[in-house]
Curated annotation (Swiss-Prot):
Keywords: Cell membrane, Membrane, Olfaction, Receptor, Sensory transduction, Transducer, Transmembrane, Transmembrane helix. It is a multi-pass membrane protein. It is found in: Cell membrane. The gene is Or19b. This is Putative odorant receptor 19b. The chain crosses the membrane at residues 41-61, 72-92, 128-148, 172-192, 255-275, 286-306, 337-357.
Length: 387
């Protein structure tokens, strides 16, 4: 990549390509696909999302024991959350696309090779996370296929209600297993995108904040400039900071409610999967299949909490940069403008879900403790039922 030409939106290209395949990012109406995209979107989402959700939900309602209920809940609840996330992306699509223009505007404000290197490092980090999640999901799907192949009796990757008799005939079983696995592969693609796109946006916001901090820290050093010129440069940096804050608030609006539901969903999934693995009678392949699912669901929330802390960390660096610039030798008007920027930088860039819950590693720890508490409660219920 040419260091003189940095495009932050490059990190988002794969995400929006997948969203187009998922049926929520229509192309131009002049193309053949664009004219028929609505029908395509309906067929895709009904086939791969609604049908699989109905089968998971009906299977959950037909549970006749605590073990089967836990096994069904740990796939039904996350899938329901992913459908809500997909609807939310469709609802906020216009605002998210418009943020690309703001990112390109910030790209044009980069002033030196060091700043461009910061943005490039952020893009590479986002792409690395995307590839890592892809590999993890691919391993999970492959393990599920191995589990199906190695099973001594007809089975599917995850507990699902099928409205026809698929166990008595080899041909019916093979057709059902292929359809079910194909649907889960499509959903794995959806999970890949919904798990990684928030982190990509948050990383881009954080690296642009870091680049701005580098620019601000250099203010007043080097060759002396007229007071009017210094004020104009500072005003430009204040505008850059306002753009970053607009991006951050846009992300918060896009992610707030679904992130709140994700904490609850992940805690429930951790609790139910652990209960099923600890107290259910499962073979080694089934155990590994559910264990990989647990790792994927936990990693998704861990990644969200980690990337949500990056803008806050770089916001603190920007505050330090304001103090570090050579403001002592500047004019009174410059200092007044700097005080305005300083006041805004003192407000931490903390992403909040559901109005009150901060998205952070501390919240992730609280979620783990909540899952353990629920697991303890389920264990007490199990002991009571055995007595």
């Amino acid at each position: 990549m040419d260091i003189s030409k940095v495009d932050s939106t490059r990190a988002l290209v794969n995400h929006w390509r997948i969203f187009r395949i998922m049926g929520i990012h229509p192309p131009g109406k002049r193309t053949f696909w664009g004219r028929h995209y609505t029908a395509y979107s309906m067929v895709w989402n009904v086939t791969f999302h609604i049908c699989i959700w109905v089968s998971f939900s009906v299977n959950l309602l037909q549970s006749n024991s605590l073990e089967t209920f836990c096994e069904s809940l740990c796939v039904t609840m996350p899938h329901t959350l992913y459908m809500l996330k997909l609807i939310n992306v469709r609802r906020m699509r216009g605002e998210m696309i418009s943020s690309h223009w703001l990112l390109r505007l910030l790209d044009k404000r980069l002033g030196c090779a060091d700043e461009r290197q910061i943005i490039m490092a952020g893009i590479e980090r986002a792409e690395f996370i995307f590839r890592t999640i892809f590999r993890g999901l691919a391993c999970t799907v492959v393990l599920g296929i191995i589990y199906i192949s190695a099973s001594s009796e007809p089975t599917l990757m995850y507990p699902t209600w099928i409205p026809w008799n698929w166990k008595d005939s080899t041909s019916a079983y093979l057709a059902t297993a292929m359809l079910h696995t194909t649907a889960l592969m499509a959903n794995a693609t959806l999970v890949l995108n919904l798990s990684s796109y928030p982190g990509t946006y948050l990383i881009l916001v954080s690296v642009h904040t870091k680049a701005l901090a580098l620019r601000v820290s250099k203010l007043g050093y080097g060759a002396p400039l007229p007071a009017v010129r210094m004020q104009a440069i500072l005003v430009g940096y204040i505008h850059d900071h306002q753009i970053i804050l607009r991006l951050f608030k846009s992300l918060e609006r896009s992610l707030s409610m679904t992130c709140f539901l994700q904490f609850f969903s992940t805690a429930c999934a951790q609790c139910t999967i652990c209960y099923f693995l600890l107290f259910g009678n499962v073979g080694i392949m089934r155990f590994m299949n559910m264990l990989f699912l647990l790792v994927i669901l936990t990693t998704e929330t861990l990644l969200l909490c980690y990337t949500a802390e990056l803008p806050c960390k770089e916001g603190e660096s920007l505050l330090t940069a304001v103090y570090s610039c050579n403001w002592l030798s500047q004019s009174v008007n410059f200092r007044r403008l700097l005080l305005l920027m300083l006041a805004r930088c003192q407000i931490p860039m903390i992403l909040v879900s559901g109005v009150i819950v901060p998205i952070s590693m501390k919240t992730f720890t609280v979620m783990i403790k909540g899952a353990y508490t629920m697991l303890t409660l389920l264990n007490e219920i199990r002991k009571t039922s055995l007595e």
